[in-house]
Each structure stands twice: as C-alpha cells, then as structure tokens.
Curated annotation (Swiss-Prot):
InterPro entries noted in UniProt: Capsid_hemagglutn (IPR008980), Rotavirus_A/C_VP6 (IPR001385), Virus_capsid_a-hlx_vir (IPR008935)
Location of region: Interaction with the inner capsid protein VP2: 62-73
GO biological process terms held by the UniProt record: fusion of virus membrane with host plasma membrane
Family matches, as HAMAP family: Rota_VP6 (MF_04126), Rota_VP6_A (MF_04129)
Compartments it resides in: Virion
This protein's record includes keyword Calcium: yes
Protein name: Intermediate capsid protein VP6
Assembly and binders: Homotrimer. Interacts with the inner capsid protein VP2. Interacts with the outer capsid glycoprotein VP7. Interacts with the outer capsid protein VP5*.
Positions with a binding annotation for Ca(2+): N266, D286
The species this protein was found in: Rotavirus A (strain RVA/SA11-Both/G3P5B[2])
C-alpha cells in the first residue's frame, strides 16, 4: 500500500513539475526519484481487472531513464517524460480500481488484488518510500493492529433515522404529545410537541428526551448545539405508526427550557452541558443524551392565547426543538465525511463496472446499512478501500 502511495506521489509531482521551460536544476531531485521508480518497475509484469465488468489488462514495464541537461527542459524532453508518466498513471489507476472492488471476510485490511500483493514485495520498497499520508499512516497501524486515529469534518456517524414516538395519543389524533426526530450524517434534529401546550402537565411543563447511541467512539469533538429544529418548524401530514391513517402537525415554535446534553462513554457521563448553546466540545463518547422541556407560557398576549386555548380543538401545536451537529472529531475507525469524496469514489467504481455484491459490503455500498452494522470485517475492508481511494484521488479527479 505504501509503495502504491509512493508511486502516486512521485507521478503527481512529475506531472505537475516536469513541464517545458523548467530549469533542470529545479527538478533534478524529482527526476532522480522518477528514474529510481523506472529502474525498480522495469522488467516486471502485472495483471489487473477480471472482476465484474472491469476488463483484464496486462502491464509490462520497459522504459528508458530521463537524462540530464544543463538548461531548461525542452519539448522533446517533456514529451518523453509525459509518455512514461501517462502509462504509469494509467497503471496506478487500474491497480486502485482493482483493489477498491475486492473484499474479504478475513484480514480485509491486507491487499486483495494480485497486482497490489505483488507491489508489496520488498524489492519495490526502493521507490522513494513515503508515509506522509494520514490514510497510509493509519493503514500501517491497523495492519499491525495498533491504535489508529482519523480526523473527520462533519463525520457521517449517525445512520439515517426519521421517526416519532407518541406519549399521548387518541384514535382521532387530535390531542397528541411526543417527540419526532431526524438523525443523519453528522446531525441530530429532535422536536418535542404537545397539541395542548402542556395545559394539564405538572407545573405546565412537558419533559422530553432523545438518546442516540453511536456505532463508534468519537474523541475531541467540536459540536454545535442550537435551541431549534428547523426541519420540524413547518406543517406536515404524518403517517400513523400502524399506517392506518395520517395526522396533521401544525407547529408553533417555542424556545426549549432546561436544555441538557450529556456525552456518555460505556454508560458513564463524560461531559454535561446545561443551557449552553453554540460551540461545545466533548472529550470521548459513544452515546448522546438530549433532554429539554416545553413550558406553557405563563403570560400570553391575546394573539398568543388564541394559539394555545385551554380546551380543544387545538389547531396549533406547541413545539420545541434542538439541533446538534458534530463539526469535527477524531475516530479510530474510518468514516465518510464532508471533506472527502472517498465513499463516492469507491461506490462509483463498483457501480460503473457492475461489481457483484460480495461477502462484506451491502448492496450499493449503502452507508446507513454499513454504519448500522459496522462489523470488524467491514471496518478493515473499508479502511483499505478508502486508503486506495485516497491514493487514486491524487491522480484521478
């Protein structure tokens, strides 16, 4: 894997810097590195593809070295270099695709394609070994079963979940009380509602709670907490739990009271925040517990009192909500996030070449399915294919 990264890094630098008019002295070190790559690869044969519709391709390396010059690189020099670069880039691209479409239930962190296994031979270590990539560094750690650490921006840690619970209901669905939520990606939005605006609740206060377990532990997380849930701020028609009917939700938004967010690890509270909004942080956690209250306004102008009458019919429904968004965090496991296109890269290649469903990943690389059942086998395979996708993205956009 590190050899593949070193190949890709060398080729990227060569493609960017070996251009007509450049002083040879400015790229002499790169050209020496490039020649070392050619020397190491010459005389070797590889085969890629042969799974799904990914075609079989044979690769033979027999290239001349780039020479030295006292002056600028001319058009002939650059054209010779470009022909070699293009062949190598095509080779790396096909090795990456061949690796990204394969999976294994056992030791899925190790190379699965014949071409990448061959590149793991000791003789290829002479290709300017480079371990500067976060993905390569963590792949080496995971391969030795040592602790890894990935930094993510808006990590997709929450499987998609959109539903509701009713703490008070009737067949007519005309005086409901409960919670509804939408968890997806890096964001939780939860709303508590009471059609009667807590008229019969103790002290005219309704208490709500929303608990979200994570599939992996997050550490050093920067989080945004807001006293609102905008996705539940407009009228909608909702299917009943049994699917027999529908009910109308017409929210009027109030500010939540006594808001508390707890971050827990193995059932123990690690961080707690009360009535604090904006940016907060959490050290390490595997569960988030949100609690908040809906309080009936003790004093109301006539216009507000019309919205919240003391008896039915309740045409407007008092609602309070919270939004929690994980902006950045560290995780030992690889995740899809907002700053990378690795999941899309892997998925698009598997779709383009009609790769059959294997023993590890769900059909279509469905992320909700994958993260909901994030087994050690899936974790190993996903880290490997994401590492390869990160290497491919250096050359192929």
């Amino acid at each position: 894997m590190d050899v593949l990264y070193s190949l890709s890094k060398t080729l990227k630098d060569a493609r960017d810097k070996i251009v007509e008019g450049t002083l040879y002295s400015n790229v002499s070190d790169l050209i020496q590195q490039f020649n070392q790559m050619i020397i190491t690869m010459n005389g070797n044969e590889f085969q890629t593809g042969g799974i799904g519709n990914l075609p079989i391709r044979n690769w033979n390396f027999n290239f001349g070295l780039l020479g030295t010059t006292l002056l600028n690189l001319d058009a002939n020099y650059v054209e010779t270099a470009r022909n070699t670069i293009d062949y190598f880039v095509d080779f790396v691209d096909n090795v990456c695709m061949d690796e990204m479409v394969r999976e294994s239930q056992r030791n899925g962190i190790a190379p699965q394609s014949d071409s990448l296994r061959k590149l793991s031979a000791i003789k290829f270590k002479r290709i300017n070994f480079d371990n500067s990539s976060e993905y390569i560094e963590n792949w080496n750690l995971q391969n030795r079963r040592q602790r890894t650490g990935f930094t993510f921006h808006k990590p997709n840690i929450f499987p998609y979940s959109a539903s509701f619970t009713l703490n008070r209901s009737q067949p007519a669905h005309d005086n409901l009380m409960g919670t509804m939520w939408l968890n997806a990606g890096s964001e939780i939005q939860v709303a508590g509602f009471d059609y009667s605006c807590a008229i019969n609740a103790p002290a005219n206060i309704q208490q709500f709670e929303h608990i979200v377990p994570l599939r992996r532990v997050l550490t050093t997380a920067t989080i945004t907490l807001l006293p609102d849930a905008e996705r539940f701020s407009f009228p909608r028609v909702i299917n009943s739990a049994d699917g027999a009917t529908t009910w109308f939700f017409n929210p009027v938004i109030l500010r939540p009271n006594n808001v508390e967010v707890e971050f827990l690890l193995n059932g123990q509270i690690i961080n707690t925040y009360q009535a604090r909004f904006g940016t907060i942080v959490a050290r390490n956690f595997d569960t988030i517990r949100l609690s908040f209250q809906l309080m009936r306004p003790p004093n109301m102008t006539p216009a507000v009192a019309v919205l919240f009458p003391n008896a039915q019919p309740f045409e407007h429904h008092a609602t309070v909500g919270l939004t929690l968004r994980i902006e950045s965090a560290v995780c030992e496991s690889v995740l899809a996030d907002a700053s990378e296109t690795l999941l899309a890269n892997v998925t698009s290649v598997r779709q383009e070449y009609a790769i059959p469903v294997g023993p590890v990943f769900p059909p279509g690389m469905n992320w909700t399915d994958l993260i909901t059942n994030y087994s050690p086998s899936r974790e190993d395979n996903l880290q490997r294919v994401f590492t390869v996708a990160s290497i491919r993205s250096m050359l192929i956009k």
